[in-house]
Amino acid sequence: MEQVKKIVLSNGVRIVLERIPYVRSASVGLWIEVGSRNEVASENGLSHFIEHMFFKGTRTKNAFQLSNEMNFIGGNVNAFTTQENICLSAKVVDEHLSRAIDLLAEIYLESLFDEEEIQRERNVVLEEVKMYNDTPDELVVDSFMGHLFADHPLGRPILGPPSNIEKFTRDDIRAYLQREFAPDRLVVSIAGNFDLRRVEPQLRRVFEPIKPNGWERNPITHPTASYSSYNEDRNLEQVHFCMGTDGPKRTSADRIAFGVMDTILGGGTSSRIFQEVREKRGLAYSIGSFDMSFKDSGCFVITGGASPSSIQEVVGLCLDEVRRLYTEDVTEEDVESARQQIKSAVLLGMENSASRMSRLAEYEIYFGEYMPVDKVIAELNAVTRNDVRQMAEKYLKGRPVTYASIGPASSFRPFAGSLSF
């Protein structure tokens, strides 16, 4: 039974804690409910840029001293940015948890955003963009998102365009922080071996003084999906493609049944797409499906890579497998296999304090309350063959498809028109 406690400070900061007494690690994360979807077009990339700058010096430590402190406490100190969140995290031996909390708090609350460091890190981020642009199997997902959620922040790349990154200033950073970063958007999550009698007072001391800023935030708008086909012409050995449609939001009651359907279709080596395209026909090395979900929307994606000569056949096979989901009943064996895959991922994640810390934070951010693992497993076990077919009929049957690819222009001709599931 998980030992979870939630504390809401007077300024709106939420703290979620799970004590795991039988481990020697502790993981702490500062989750800020701000990401690329909070940005206007001219700010695109600023959330990710700020994430980088958090590690470049505070009032008492320069970047090198911060690195030394991270090395001293050992473990892993990390950060990432998504469409909806920025996370600063550390996984350490339990005896160093107090120092890890203070370190992350100092990074979050006292970063200087020095002009010289901004210029230096600007070059680092521009190199990151170049690296990403040289990775077509990842870049094509951004292209897909940009066309599915056209003219909406969810369709913009998290890293942002170079033209924005080259212009970001200290004033831009400060204005964005004042507008979007507020205590009621901060979730502090800790999982591992710790003494609540020591940790809770420390967290109150560090985070209770944060004052609401009172600034008007950029309004969050609901995305509307659009459907089109697009290819970026590159002289590559493979065509990297991504196709899909909009799907359930993060809090949808359909999320677990939809996950079972997705796993049957393209989640792993036993999935229908993988077996049909790779194992039976040898037409691709990488092929599969996944879903992404946000607070108010989501999307379902099939992605892979194939030779220009076989891309039309591969895409056709994927479409056939999608249509089978709503024209034929899946077997009980299919459903049970998918259940076991998802169940294993959930339960194995419970062996890791960092995974449990992330799970705590994500449930707080998206649901406002924690869902015990037993309840998740019970909902998973309740998914039936009929539920899977209903998900396919509700979210996929006849739905228009957005198709994006990166590869030779000649490979795109069969997909220049409209596609549908």
Segments predicted by a language model, with ranges:
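Catalytic cores of enzymes that engage adenine nucleotides and/or redox cofactors via long glycine-rich
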Residues: P223-A225, E276
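Charge-rich, well-structured scaffold segments of protease-associated domains
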Residues: E2-V4, V8, R19, A63-W215, ...
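Flexible, small-/acidic-enriched active-site or ligand-binding loops
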Residues: S228
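Active/ligand-binding-proximal structured segments within catalytic/core domains
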Residues: G12, R19-M70, F144, M243, ...
